[in-house]
Amino acid sequence: MTKLNLTHIEECMDDYDLFLFDLWGVIIEGGETYPGVVEALNKIIAKKEVIFLSNAPRPDFIVARNLRNWGVLDATPPMVITSGDVARQLIVDYRKSSLNDQIPKIFHLGSDRNDDILLEIDYLAINNINEADILLLSVFRDEHEDIHEFDEFLKGKIL
């Protein structure tokens, strides 16, 4: 792989047709975009194909809206691929292939801020994990949180 000696990404715009950007840690950190990133993205989007990648449990339309709110003016859902989109598609596929198109019963273990992963999907939210067709995990724990928080809850559950 060739090492690029760039001071600004715009210097290599003519060398590539497609730009893939991870969001967290590349475009944004701690709720703030990095300096100069929005301006550079808008210039690249005007001339090249751009795809944004994220491990966020969010639908593409939510992330595209966030990008526009940050100033990335032409961000659209087809430009975004998230782990949330993958999960959403798997739920839809499972409903068709394994549930005879019946509405899936989903037990979602995750924080309230991740509830948008299920926006615009027909499902039944249930509180009993043993009755679930699908166990959706979108919980996040950083190094300051207890990773064993759910051990007791999950003990003895049918998984």
Which residues fall in each region the model found?
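HAD-like aspartate-dependent phosphatase fold
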Residues: M1-L159
